[in-house]
UniProtKB/Swiss-Prot annotation:
Glycans are attached at N39, N336, N417, N429, N444, N457, N512, N524. This is Tyrosine-protein kinase-like otk. Acts as a calcium-dependent, homophilic cell adhesion molecule that regulates neural recognition during the development of the nervous system. Component of the repulsive Plexin signaling response to regulate motor axon guidance at the embryonic stage. Also component of a receptor complex that is required in the adult visual system to innervate the lamina layer; specific targeting of R1-R6 axons. Residues 25-114, 113-199, 251-365, 368-463, 468-558 form the Ig-like C2-type domain. It holds the Pfam family I-set. It comes from Drosophila yakuba.
């Protein structure tokens, strides 16, 4: 390790130590992810519950501290951004609360800001052939997470929908078997909360064969002599077709004298007329001629001027007369060709052109005229009153106005100086937005639309309501005897107060259509039926509702006759049945109490007798002058959570004495000896709480808080001394309890334990390294402290004991040491070894540049090389092999549960910060927080943990190392999807891209479904060693 590397990693240490500091405060209000229209304002709220200390709030944007200005500023603890810009403001925002007294700080979860915008749209051709026309509407814009982008397609001016051969598929338009009816200009529009745009250029589709049909000519008709030799062919040809270019020009004396005015500006609602004066020569009056008006190229109106039969417009308009609809406002005058409008509307705006069409000739067209409409100021649609749900995060009331020029929209509230209340704002589109709806938002709000035409307004009533809920829902099915009484409860809460309506078999019940002597509708909504009849059986529904909505619950009423097993009522009526039920209940309760008291007395007597025998036995074994190690047998009662040995492989080796005792006494005696032995072991681990200092909370685990602190160097014992003392006590305990045990058996057991502790390392090397650290006088040891807060939680206590036994039994430089246990008072403290660089995941994030570690005059540390990653993986494999040889399982192996020192030494640890810091990496499954993305399938399905499941998790750890821990395994899936696919065996794993080729096969074998086919840690260590040698060459 070079001096440069140590200097760089020192900077990483400083940043990581600052990042793990956390105060005891919690956030009362957290920043929420939001989607906002570009150029609108947004506010992120942040507030801590620590009201007793002075707090300072800071905000980070994408991991960098925000530089405030007039547009981005902080008011109190909240962050305000005016005129949001998508190029600068998109990303994640984190609130940092710092306690000025202690310097501890806490970070909120990141809140994401998405910007909604829309710029342009264009039509793209994806494919065109005889069988299918495929177009796509490409949109430059984003809709955030709130509302999807809405796409509409138009053919010429006709809006398209999925019908016949036309199919709309999200952004795509599919026309199957396109024909001449599908010819035209295709355009699309896209809209979202930011606005609406139409494609500037569309796509013109023309079928491959287009010809002009010729009408059969009657014998009585004659063609003019000058055209006798003209021939009209209809021949489809690949690559082109005969069109209007092949038609002859119309006679020169057939012309339009005056067309529409080049530009007309008309107010909406006023009448107007478009002129089309034409000249028709006498020789053509018997010919088939049509006068046509077109709007934006589409045929609008037509009239026959000569001939006895109309001319088909199919030749020139492909049969699409979309604008030839009934409209009484439009009248086409045949005499002078004028197109008159009785009343102009906004949709009449466009380009108009009149034409004279002589059969089989090029049409004669006038100059186009543009009609502009001054749209009247109006609301589209009219704003309406609305009910808002109480405590809704966001509620909107729309107010859209149209007019020429575009009107400005604003909102005011009646009273209170016409100002809007807090948490109510207006966006750029005129939408009234309510945030965190409360009762103060009730009232009348007026929408004002203003332009040069004037001002219009619309007032709406906003009411804050609470959706009706069942406080006492009807519960069934209900069985009752004939002629009995039944009560069906139904009570509701809400604002306004909900009404309650009963029905039977979907027929409403009321006092008017029921027997008032038998049916009673109580004021609280309960239905009471007396003298129940057989015909009363059925399904009863209770419907509650107010202005906020409706809810309904059904219950089935079953009426039993006497023959069905119900006894007829006695003369005493209901009173006799109630009395009999009370007497039976009281008798059963009294018998239960007597039984419980008797069992308590018997257990107390047996416990005292057993303790007396144990005290006598202990006195005899110790020579009569050795006190009980557990304090006269009371240690197990004082420490109920740590009184039993729950290590699955540690079994009592005590043998029964020669005394003839009953089987239950023998079992109780062996259990008591095991408890005394376990308590004696915990006494050896005892540490005074006063030896701990500078405790700083870094998070919360499965059974309590987790701290980082310092332990006095005088309390740190050498691992060799600790092991020798422990083995000596084990030997004495076994020799004392098993009078006939041999010394050779004890010696072989100790040797076996020593071998399990050394694993693949030399025990003398461990002693020399750790003894050197211990002899450095005047230094304090950095430790990790895990508190046992849930003393009464049996599952938490069992896991606490399991981790104690795991770390106590292993002495290996790849696994953190257990320094001791503080049991002087609650909560109990488990004191573990900790390193100066902290947990491995934060180290990987820092080297990947995901954590800002740079200080003044320095840069972020470089990413790890492949050789360094392999070295880390190798050290973890050696530590896990030691755990395997000690016949333990880890169950939560991940980079977050490993620590790394400034000497680049990695150790397997067990912080397990599953409640806050790494809560995203845990999921509650079967009422237990599990790291499901690291667990083997058998752990999730059958709760079966073995060394092979640790192998599975190790493969995920190597995947984390090569990805620098920058992403979660299968982060594209939700936790529920991971559980489902893991149980179904369909969760697919792949190694990281930077993984060496020599490791890919063995790492993939870590994730096979059959645990027996997975490799061992020793095989993984050998493969990693070879890979390290290859990487160094």
């Amino acid at each position: 390790m070079t001096a440069r590397m140590i200097s760089i990693y020192g900077l990483v240490l400083a940043s990581m130590m600052a990042s793990v500091l956390a105060s005891s405060s919690r956030f009362q209000r957290l920043p929420q992810s939001q989607s906002v229209v570009e150029n609108e304002s947004v506010k992120f709220e942040c507030e801590s519950t620590d009201s007793y200390s002075e707090l300072h709030y800071d905000w980070l944007h994408n991991g960098h501290r925000i530089a405030y200005d007039k547009r981005v500023h902080q008011i109190g603890s909240n962050l305000h951004i005016e005129a949001v810009r998508r190029t600068e403001d998109v990303g994640s925002y984190v609130c940092i609360a710092t306690n000025l007294a202690s310097g501890a700080r806490e970070a909120s979860p990141p809140a994401k800001l998405s910007v909604i915008y829309i710029e342009s749209a264009s039509v793209q051709l994806l494919g065109s052939n005889r069988n299918e026309l495929l177009l796509k509407c490409h949109v430059e814009g984003a809709s955030g997470d709130s509302e999807p982008l809405e796409i509409e397609w138009y053919r010429n001016s006709e809006k398209l929908s999925t019908w016949r051969n036309v199919q709309l598929d999200q952004h795509r338009l599919i026309v199957r078997q396109p024909g001449s009816d599908d010819d035209g200009l295709y355009r699309c529009t896209a809209s979202n909360a930011a606005g609406r745009v139409m494609s500037k250029q569309g796509y013109v589709y023309q079928s491959s064969v287009k010809c002009l049909p010729r009408l059969a000519r009657r014998k009585s008709q004659k063609v003019m002599e000058s055209w006798d030799k003209q021939t009209f062919l209809c021949r489809g040809k690949r690559g082109g077709a005969a069109g209007l270019e092949a038609l002859p020009a119309a006679p020169e004396d057939l012309r339009i004298v005056q067309g529409p005015i080049a530009q007309s500006i008309i107010k909406e609602g006023e009448p107007t007329a478009l002129t089309c004066l034409y000249e028709l020569p006498d020789e053509l009056k018997n010919q088939r001629i049509q006068l046509r008006w077109r709007k934006d190229g589409k045929l609008l109106r037509q009239v026959e001027l000569g001939g006895s039969a109309p001319i088909s417009g199919h030749s020139f308009d492909s049969g699409k007369d979309a604008l030839l609809r009934e409209d009484a406002r439009l009248v086409l005058h045949k005499q002078n060709g004028t197109l008159s409008f009785a009343s102009i509307i906004a949709s009449d705006a466009g380009q108009y052109q009149c034409q004279l069409q002589l059969e089989a000739h090029v049409p004669v067209s006038s100059s186009p005229g543009v009609l502009e409409v001054i749209e009247q100021l109006k609301f589209v649609p009219q704003p309406t009153s609305k009910n808002l749900e109480l405590d809704a995060v966001v509620a909107k009331v729309h107010c859209k106005a149209q007019g020429t020029p575009t009107p400005q929209v604003q909102w005011v509230r009646e009273g209170e100086n016409n100002t809007l209340p807090d948490q109510v704002e207006v966006d750029a589109n005129g939408t009234l937005i309510f945030r965190n709806v409360n009762s103060e938002h009730r009232g009348n709000y007026t929408c004002l639309a203003t332009n040069t035409q004037g001002q219009i307004n619309a007032t709406v009533a906003i009411n804050v309501v609470v959706t009706p809920k069942f406080s006492v829902p009807p519960v069934g099915p209900i069985e009752t005897a004939e002629l009995g009484t039944v009560v069906i409860h139904c009570q509701a809460i809400g604002d306004p107060k909900p009404t309650i309506q009963w029905d039977k078999d979907l027929k409403y019940l009321s006092e008017n259509n029921t027997d008032r002597e038998r049916f009673r509708f109580l004021e609280n909504g309960t239905l009471e039926i007396r003298n129940v009849q057989v015909e009363d059986e059925g399904s009863y529904g209770c419907t509650i509702g107010n202005s906020a909505g409706l809810k309904r619950e059904d219950v089935q009423l079953i009426v039993k006759t006497t023959g069905d097993g119900f006894a007829p009522e006695e003369s005493g009526g209901d009173g006799f049945l109630v009395t009999r039920a009370v007497l039976i209940t009281m008798t059963v309760a009294l018998a239960y109490i007597v039984l419980v008291v008797g069992l308590m007395l018997w257990c107390r007597y047996r416990r005292q007798a057993r303790k007396a025998r144990l005290n006598d036995l202990s006195t005899k074994e110790a020579g009569g002058d050795q006190p009980d190690a557990t304090g006269n047998g009371k240690g197990s009662e004082q420490e109920p959570c740590l009184s039993k040995q729950h290590n699955g492989h540690s079994k009592s080796r005590s043998k029964s004495s020669g005394d003839a005792q009953k089987s239950d006494d023998t079992a109780c005696s062996q259990q008591s000896r095991a408890s005394k032995k376990s308590a004696h072991i915990y006494e050896q681990l005892a540490l005074p709480r006063s030896g701990l200092s500078e405790l700083i909370q870094i998070g919360r685990g499965e059974f309590g808080d987790v701290f980082v602190g310092k332990l006095k160097a005088t309390l740190v014992t050498s691992p060799s001394d600790k092991d020798a003392d422990t083995e000596k006590q084990h030997s004495n305990s076994e020799n004392g309890s098993g009078g006939s045990g041999s010394g050779s058996t004890t010696l072989s057991t100790l040797n076996e334990k020593r071998r399990s502790k050394t694993s693949m390392d030399d025990i003398e090397e461990i002693k020399e390294e750790e003894q050197e650290q211990h002899n450095q006088s005047g230094l304090e040891q950095l430790v990790l402290v895990k508190a046992l807060n849930k003393v009464k939680d049996e599952q938490a206590c069992q896991e606490f004991r399991r981790q104690l036994d795991l770390l106590r039994a292993i002495s290996h430089k790849g696994v953190v040491r257990l320094f001791g246990l503080c049991r002087e008072k609650d909560p109990h403290y488990m004191v573990l070894e900790y390193t100066d660089w902290g947990d491995l995941k934060q180290f990987l994030l820092a080297t990947a540049g995901k954590v800002n570690t740079a200080t003044a005059g320095s840069s972020s540390p470089p990413p790890l090389t492949t050789s360094q990653v392999l070295a880390v993986a190798y050290q973890i494999a050696r530590g896990m092999d030691a755990i395997y040889r000690a016949r333990f399982t880890h169950r939560d192996l991940a980079t977050r549960n490993c620590v790394i020192s400034s000497e680049f030494i990695v150790k397997v640890s067990y912080p397990a910060l599953c409640k806050d810091k790494y809560s995203r990496e845990y999921h509650k499954h079967r009422n237990t927080l599990l790291p499901i993305r690291w667990l083997a399938p058998e752990c999730i399905q059958e709760d079966e943990y073995t060394t092979k499941s640790d192998i599975f998790a190790y493969g995920v750890v190597v995947w984390e190392l090569f990805n620098q821990a920058t992403k979660l395994p299968h982060e594209e899936l939700t936790n529920e999807q991971v559980v489902q696919r893991s149980q179904a065996g369909s969760l697919e794993w792949s190694v990281a891209e930077s993984t060496p080729d020599s490791l890919r096969e063995i790492l993939l074998s870590c994730w096979v479904a059959n645990p027996k086919e997975r490799p061992s840690f020793s095989q993984l260590g050998a493969a990693l060693s070879k890979a390290m040698q290859s990487a160094e060459k």
